[in-house]
């Protein structure tokens, strides 16, 4: 048996599915070795993909695909387990054949994509190209094969397999329905009106009918249909017309950790950031400061970003006797690091280096109380700050000048004035892919006091689970699949606050009290809290949960 797992997010960081795949891959490699492969789209400048020569037995397939405008890349994903990967470069194929295949999928499945846009056409063309590749494999491999596809973006491959009657058993996993995500992005509470929604009609009114039809047909024709939470199971049955065969919670690949050491290392980075980003403008009492963050895709209403900003506005005007610095890690289009921010960062790096090189001289002047000479040494290298200026809200120059997050922050009076109790750092980039935020994500986030996730639409909620894995006190919406799973597993904790976002204004004082409670913990008590939170994450370990998928694979293998 060979297993092929397909997703648009293989070696391509977009959202939570990237974490699903990258965190469980090592367990599937351990079980299936070289019989497990991942398939994704080929993108230029992929950091984590290590390309290798095409295997000898696939050379003819490589040539056949090339004649169709499909370029096959082979190698491994440079993560734990180093799973083998096929990445499909398909843009020549896209240009040549997109209209033909849109017609064929109308003929086969009545998918109405005549007026579809690029957000459909691009992954659709890729999924067909993957289908053609798997068809070529089917000609030379007679043994049992399984395709496990994620989200509607991979759905075209399953439908290709079924239309061509290829020798593959298929699994489809959805992580959120097209209709649910779209309605929620318009600030509509899907679960409140789910019984009133005619999904097929609604899809046309929202102009997402082609994505919905792809998703619905994939759910209908796959051999096994799975999803990641009870909420999404209800949604799938209503919108896609099929109840999932299995709910399998997302998990992480966990390892024992030194929580105290990790926290202190990350905290040092965080305090150093505040030193160069804020301190040139005004003093911040770090001992009286609470560091909070949120992280996720740029979905303003779905991720509850507006609610987080409303909370900060409330706290800024409240009687809270703490400083709060909120980091918003929400990637979007940027042209580069803001000029002023880059100057501050470079000045700080130079000062650090200069201090090390002149340390003996500086100590000599200190001993002799020659403070003016120390000032003279550094004067030329200190950043020049104009009068009445303040730290930038956003770290990078945004392509979109009417950025909704930035505008909401400014409208809410969160503009980093010295008098503000709440300061904000809006970082619109992926952590670890930037010279300012140049460490792996976990090495930055572990230094925060509280993570906050107030999603309206979050069928599972990986960011909150990762926060729990880091041992960080968590504020989480009651609408997420993860928060409901905590209840189902009886894993509630006083260090994890569930927020009723339907009655958000009534919850504000409760959230403030939670923040004050966390900030009041003595360091040793705080470490105990972190260990308690981390222990909750152990109930979401792929080491155990992966067996759910393995059982499905083995069952399908026995049916072939």
Q: Which ranges hold each PLM region?
A:
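Catalytic cores of nucleotide-sugar-dependent glycosyltransferases that transfer UDP/GDP/TDP-activated
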Residues: 1-560
């Amino acid at each position: 048996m060979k297993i092929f797992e397909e997703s648009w997010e293989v070696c391509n960081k977009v959202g939570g599915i990237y974490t699903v795949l990258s965190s469980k891959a090592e367990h599937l490699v351990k079980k299936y070795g070289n019989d497990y492969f991942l398939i994704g789209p080929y993108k230029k400048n992929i950091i984590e993909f290590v390309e290798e020569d095409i295997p000898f037995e696939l050379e003819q397939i490589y040539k056949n695909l090339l004649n169709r405008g499909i370029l096959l890349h082979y190698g491994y994903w440079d993560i734990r387990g180093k799973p083998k990967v096929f990445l499909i470069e398909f843009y020549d194929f896209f240009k040549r054949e997109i209209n033909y295949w849109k017609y064929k999928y109308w003929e086969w499945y009545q998918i109405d994509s005549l007026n579809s846009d690029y957000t459909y056409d691009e992954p659709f063309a890729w999924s067909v190209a993957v289908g053609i590749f798997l068809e070529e494999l089917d000609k030379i491999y007679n043994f049992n094969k399984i395709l496990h596809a994620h989200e509607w973006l991979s759905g075209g491959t399953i439908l290709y397999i079924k239309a061509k009657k290829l020798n593959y058993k298929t699994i489809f996993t959805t992580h959120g329905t097209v209709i649910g995500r779209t309605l929620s992005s318009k600030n509509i509470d899907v679960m409140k009106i789910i019984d009133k929604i005619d999904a097929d009609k609604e899809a046309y009114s929202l102009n997402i009918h082609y994505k919905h039809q792809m998703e619905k047909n994939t759910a209908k024709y796959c051999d096994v249909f799975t999803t990641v939470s009870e909420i999404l199971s209800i949604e799938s049955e209503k919108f896609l017309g099929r109840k999932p065969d299995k709910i399998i919670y997302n998990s992480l690949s966990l390892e024992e950790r030194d929580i105290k050491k990790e926290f202190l290392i990350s905290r040092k980075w965080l305090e150093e950031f505040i030193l160069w980003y804020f301190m040139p403008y005004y003093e911040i009492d770090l001992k009286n400061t609470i560091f909070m963050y949120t992280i996720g895709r740029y979905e303003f209403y779905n991720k509850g970003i507006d609610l987080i900003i409303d909370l900060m506005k409330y706290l800024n005007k409240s009687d809270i006797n703490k400083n709060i610095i909120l980091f918003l890690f929400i990637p979007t289009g940027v042209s580069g690091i803001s000029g002023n921010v880059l100057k501050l960062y470079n000045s700080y790096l130079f000062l650090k280096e200069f201090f090390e090189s002149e340390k003996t001289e500086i100590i000599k002047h200190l001993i002799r109380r020659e403070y003016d000479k120390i000032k003279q040494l550094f004067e030329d290298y200190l950043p020049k700050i104009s009068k009445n200026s303040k730290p930038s809200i956003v770290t990078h120059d945004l392509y979109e000048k009417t950025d909704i997050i930035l505008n909401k922050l400014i409208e809410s009076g969160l503009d980093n004035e010295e008098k503000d109790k709440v300061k904000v750092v809006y970082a619109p980039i992926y952590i670890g892919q930037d010279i300012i935020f140049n460490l792996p994500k976990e090495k930055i986030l572990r230094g925060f006091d509280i993570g906050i996730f107030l999603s309206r639409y979050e069928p599972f909620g990986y960011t909150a689970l990762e926060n729990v894995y880091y041992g960080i006190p968590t504020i989480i919406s009651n609408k997420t699949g993860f928060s409901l799973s905590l209840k189902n597993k009886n894993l509630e904790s006083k260090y994890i606050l569930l927020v009723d976002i339907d009655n958000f204004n009534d919850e504000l004082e409760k959230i403030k009290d939670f923040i004050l409670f966390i900030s009041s913990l003595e360091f040793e008590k705080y470490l105990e809290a972190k260990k308690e939170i981390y222990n909750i994450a152990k109930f979401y370990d792929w080491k155990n949960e992966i067996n759910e998928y393995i059982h499905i694979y083995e069952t399908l293998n026995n049916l072939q």
